[in-house]
UniProtKB/Swiss-Prot annotation:
This is FMN-dependent NADH:quinone oxidoreductase 5. One of its GO terms (molecular function) is electron transfer activity. Belongs to the azoreductase type 1 family. It comes from Burkholderia lata (strain ATCC 17760 / DSM 23089 / LMG 22485 / NCIMB 9086 / R18194 / 383). Keywords: Flavoprotein, FMN, NAD, Oxidoreductase. InterPro entries: Flavodoxin_fold (IPR003680), Flavoprotein-like_sf (IPR029039), FMN-dep_NADH:Q_OxRdtase_AzoR1 (IPR050104), NADH:quinone_OxRdtase_FMN_depd (IPR023048). It catalyses: 2 a quinone + NADH + H(+) = 2 a 1,4-benzosemiquinone + NAD(+); N,N-dimethyl-1,4-phenylenediamine + anthranilate + 2 NAD(+) = 2-(4-dimethylaminophenyl)diazenylbenzoate + 2 NADH + 2 H(+). The keyword Oxidoreductase applies. The keyword NAD applies. Its EC number is 1.6.5.-, 1.7.1.17. FMN binds at residue 10. It comes from the Bacteria. Homodimer.
Length: 204
């Protein structure tokens, strides 16, 4: 079984340019694995519930996974656990991840469930798998032409490493109105990512 989890963090949903590129990545995955299952998790409207006092209490009290307050977290973690690869499409908001993606992270990073706290630091409890992050930024945040900082990339790398994911690629689509050449360049990078290159190799 080759399951792909697609996490879409754009408030524009399927209408966003990032989502359009993501659909092309998904199509490449499905072409390599016609019977693969794709699970889509949209973080736009209506979005995930806010972190509640009951949820916070369940974490502190180390309640069992079956506790109703942990239901949303359990569902999101299960989607990650059952995947063989993860595709995240996200805008960059104020130099970092949007609030909707931060909320998903807060539900997925859970002590005793996706990571363990040890004297040496946090250790991931999930097996590594390829992750591809498509980043849509209105400003230029990389290279000599950068005019704004990028806190999204190092933050997401650390977040994913905490739960055990180290095979992570980032592809960026920058600028308010990227031209066709920029979009084609992004398309060319898709096949070079661990997520899609590995799948192409497996079917060769």
């Amino acid at each position: 079984m080759n399951n792909l989890l697609f996490v879409d963090a754009s408030p524009h949903g399927s209408r966003s340019l990032g989502a359009r590129i993501a659909r092309e990545a998904i199509a490449q995955w499905q072409a390599a694995h016609p019977h693969a299952r794709v699970v889509s998790r949209s973080l736009g409207q209506p979005g995930l519930p806010s972190i509640s006092a009951d949820y916070a209490h369940a974490l502190v009290a180390r309640q069992p996974d079956s506790d109703p307050a942990l239901a949303c977290s359990e569902q999101l973690i299960a989607e990650v656990e059952h995947s063989d690869g993860v595709l995240i499409s996200t805008p960059m908001h104020n130099f970092t991840v949007p609030a909707a993606l931060k909320l998903w992270i807060d539900f997925v990073l859970r002590i005793g469930r996706t990571f363990a706290a040890t004297p040496e630091g946090k250790v991931g409890l999930l097996a590594d798998r390829p992750v591809l992050v498509l980043v849509r930024s209105g400003g230029i945040c990389r290279g000599a032409a950068a005019r704004q900082p990028d806190f999204l990339t190092p933050y997401l790398k650390q977040v994913l490493a905490v739960i055990g994911f180290s095979t992570v690629d980032f592809i960026y689509l920058e600028g308010v109105a990227p031209d066709d050449a920029a979009i084609d360049a992004v398309r060319g990078q898709l096949a070079q990512s661990a997520l899609l290159a590995r799948r192409a190799t497996e079917t060769a």
